[in-house]
Regions:
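Loop-centered beta-sheet repeat module
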Residues: 99-148
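Residue-level detector of alpha-helical recognition elements and their boundaries
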Residues: 29, 41, 82-84, 97, ...
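Glycine-rich loops and low-complexity Gly/Arg-rich segments
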Residues: 19, 49-53, 93-96, 108-110, ...
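Sequence/structural signature of outer-membrane beta-barrel proteins
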Residues: 2-3, 33, 51, 87-91, ...
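Outer membrane beta-barrel
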Residues: 1-90, 117-122, 126-134
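Detector for outer-membrane/organellar transmembrane beta-barrel domains
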Residues: 127-193
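Outer-membrane beta-barrel translocator domains and adjoining extracellular loop/strand segments
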Residues: 4-11, 38-43, 92-100, 146-156, ...
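Transmembrane beta-barrel outer-membrane domains
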Residues: 4-9, 58-62, 114-118, 153-160, ...
Length: 193
């Protein structure tokens, strides 16, 4: 600890159980996108490094401050999550944070000193009705955050749609995910920064 200046907390939230199928959550939580961000411990993916999509597009470990609901609908075999989060930070102290070579990774706020100029919406549905199969559909929509909202070009729009599937049968395990990320207002942002 002699050279440590900060300590990061991965998750810290309160969860209130409304009933058997619904919870309200608030605090520092993982953004529900894809497979690896929610299940990111090294023993849960095959390889030394995280997949490229989970390093730059879904910048695991991606956690933000938020509030929302989670639960399940047993008769439909669905698990759901819906949250309002602070978004990626794109501009602070008079300079841009995001660069194309890093994807969205450097914009993660991780809870510490987070700026919220407009909340972002994130949700995920998981279907678990077939033994061994889990299929997920996730979405993330909003704008990046800035510490100076008077500079209009300091934010960009972020829209992500994700589809993931996992299947396990005996010793066979198959996984796949597809993430479509769209950024808007990038030309104005690049001109500014």
């Amino acid at each position: 600890y002699e050279h440590v200046q900060e300590v990061y907390v991965e998750q810290a939230y309160l969860k209130y159980k409304l009933n058997e199928n619904a919870n309200v959550l608030a605090g520092l939580m993982l953004v529900p996108m894809g497979i690896i961000n929610e299940y990111h411990e090294p023993t849960t993916f095959y390889g030394v490094e995280r997949p490229n999509v989970d390093a730059a597009i879904v910048p695991t470990t991606w956690r933000e401050l938020g509030v929302g609901i989670s639960g399940k609908i047993d008769n439909a075999s669905l698990k759901y999550q819906a949250y309002l989060f602070n978004g990626f930070k794109s501009y602070a102290g008079g300079s841009g944070i995001l660069r194309g070579s890093d994807g969205l990774r450097k914009g993660r706020q991780k809870g510490a000193e987070s700026v919220v100029s407009s909340p972002n919406f994130s949700s995920k549905l998981d279907y678990y009705g077939i033994p061994g199969l889990r299929v997920g559909l996730s979405g993330y929509f909003g704008k990046t955050q800035t510490d100076d909202s008077s500079i209009e070009a300091s934010t960009i729009g972020v829209a992500m749609i994700g589809f993931d599937a996992r299947y396990k049968y005996n010793n066979l395990e198959l996984r796949g995910q597809y993430i479509n990320a769209n950024l808007s207002d990038t030309e104005d942002y690049n001109t500014l920064t």
